Amino acid sequence: MRPDVKINDLSLFTLGWLRESVDFPTPQSQTNTIVVPGRNAPIRYTEALGSISYQPREFTILLSMLGSRTQFDSKVAEVVNRFAGRLCKVICSDTPQVYAIGTLEAEPAYDPLTGKGQLTLSCEDGDSYLYHVKETVVTKSGSGTVTLSNDYMPVVPVVETTGETTLAWRVGEEEFRKSVSAGTWEFPEMELQAGENQLTVTADGMTTFRYREGRL
């Protein structure tokens, strides 16, 4: 498979660029510790709110091409004017099922002796998680149990109902129950965790759950 990268669904290979390398390091967790005199262990607040938050994702993409300086400048201008300083969706051909979101900056360099030009695209403010390209949609007709499978990123689904519907689910030891009419709903308490999440639906019509999964 030819290494490529898509930015906002545009293949950079089709613009004449070869992808030399990509660097997508894992974002670090947001940590906050307090050292207390007399204690042998610090007070850690990494999971103080019940879940872990992460630093912005940083990544770098190195592109190259062979040609004259004029050709290089033209190709650089095409990429820079489209994407530099803009919030973009980035998909690598190695992992086409997920995408990153972040603001791109560009740094070109050209060697007249070899005729090789390079363009480095970098991001320092990317979303921590990589998102699934395809939105997850689960539809239930009538009443019954629904299992919502989720990747590692916690996410709150959008619930669409076509009539009077009652939803019931459990988070840890706490139970929740919501009765709604036809419409579109979001319940912060219905945050899906990694793995399988079960809910009970009581309805005569259709109930649809939509959410976008993600992972580090």
Language model feature labels by segment:
Residues 56, 85, 192-196:
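Extracellular Ig-like/FN3 beta-sandwich strand-entry sites
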Residues 24-58:
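Short, solvent-exposed beta-alpha or beta-beta edge segments that form flexible loop/patches at the rim
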Residues 129-216:
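Intrinsically disordered, low-complexity segments enriched in serine, threonine, and glycine
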Residues 24-28, 85-129:
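Short beta-strand and beta-hairpin "edge-sheet" elements
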Residues 1-38:
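Polar/acidic, low-complexity leader/linker segments enriched in S/T/G and N/D
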Residues 44-69, 114-128, 197:
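Oligomerization/assembly interface segments of phage tail-like spikes and tubes
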Residues 74-84:
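Short amphipathic alpha-helices in soluble, non-transmembrane regions
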Residues 6-11, 124-128, 191:
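Mixed-charge, glycine-accented linear interaction segment located at domain edges/termini
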